[in-house]
């Protein structure tokens, strides 16, 4: 995406949408809070094409295996790039288009009670493929679990937590004011997934079913995706016979202000099409077009 010259009203991370219809102008004023404008989309995905695909990718015994998470995340961010309204948000009653596409998620350092969590944020480029995204996730996870990576967002929270309570509350109120105007410096929010295009959580990895996660008034994220636990489901095959196939339920929470229902419906169809044809994720976006169906 080409860099645009920053104008008055733009944020560091986004461009103010000036030529908008009356509805989108008014909605940010009368419905100013993101958490008050949540809409929910439930989708069930057949994992059989993805299972075959990741088995092929893992055939050579690579140390960091491809998983369903990598495929779903890649398909989702490619959908966001191809459907740019999904990369919009409201802040301070204004309507913005992000300058970049990013994906945020939380890394559990180990599966144990009391284990620490760290935040990860990936920048996705039009030329990104599942291979490049897989490698970036590998680096994020390895650095986090080996505690080599300095996460400025986590460090900022630790500093605030160490202050006297009255000081930390005052500091957080000031930071929230900065957030409202898009003035938070990177040392505070550099790796905060609440500022991502897509915030994704794999609850299936801890054996929980899919649900919905709320949006937050902090940050700018307008799209949250929950991946549930895999399960066997009776489905019709191409001959009309019922057979058990592995599926996963996805729960999408979206800001209903940024796009209409028709736009979301076409976006979900594209997302599922990419999951049904995962080899497309090996192509850069300049070689992917939307399905005509």
Locate the predicted segments by residue.
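Conserved glycine-centered short motifs in functionally critical loops
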Residues: 72, 107-113, 207-282
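Helical lid/core segments from catalytic subdomains that handle acyl or acyl-like groups
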Residues: 57, 116-204
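Extended low-complexity intrinsically disordered regions
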Residues: 2-43, 49-56
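Residue-level detector of conserved catalytic or cofactor/ligand-binding positions
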Residues: 286-293
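Acyl/amide activation-and-transfer machinery of modular secondary-metabolite enzymes
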Residues: 32-42, 52-55, 102, 106-126, ...
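Gly/Ser/Thr-rich phosphate-binding loops and adjoining beta-strand/alpha-helix segments
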Residues: 35-65, 90-101
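Flexible, Gly/Pro-enriched loop and linker segments at secondary-structure and domain junctions
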Residues: 26, 32, 36-40, 69, ...
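Hydrophobic "lid/gating" helix adjacent to the active-site nucleophile
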Residues: 67-101
